[in-house]
């Protein structure tokens, strides 16, 4: 009963730290470059063959805008007002027209 079970997943609260993995050898073979007349420079110590680890920045959650803020923005912004166009007149006319057409087709089918 006193035995502790090791957790399967590390307790890092969902954050994943970057790891320096070596880059795969994706360079073309030297002989194909040399046969094409290219000079191959020696490896340079200035450019290491490892990825640099990105610094860890904690997430800063910004306050989400309220619905009123979004509505005011959509009204005042010319781009957003075109994207969020709320004029549904054309859709209503198309729906009414298709409903009348369906009604006439059903009426014609039932007469036969």
Curated annotation (Swiss-Prot):
Family designation: Belongs to the IIV-6 466R family.
Lineage: Viruses, Varidnaviria, Bamfordvirae, Nucleocytoviricota, Megaviricetes
Location relative to the cell: Membrane
Any single Gene Ontology cellular-component annotation: membrane
Transmembrane helix found in the keyword field: yes
Protein name per UniProt: Uncharacterized protein 112R
Alphabetic keyword roster: Membrane, Transmembrane, Transmembrane helix
Main localisation: membrane
Record-annotated membrane-spanning stretches: 89-106
Membrane topology value: Single-pass membrane protein
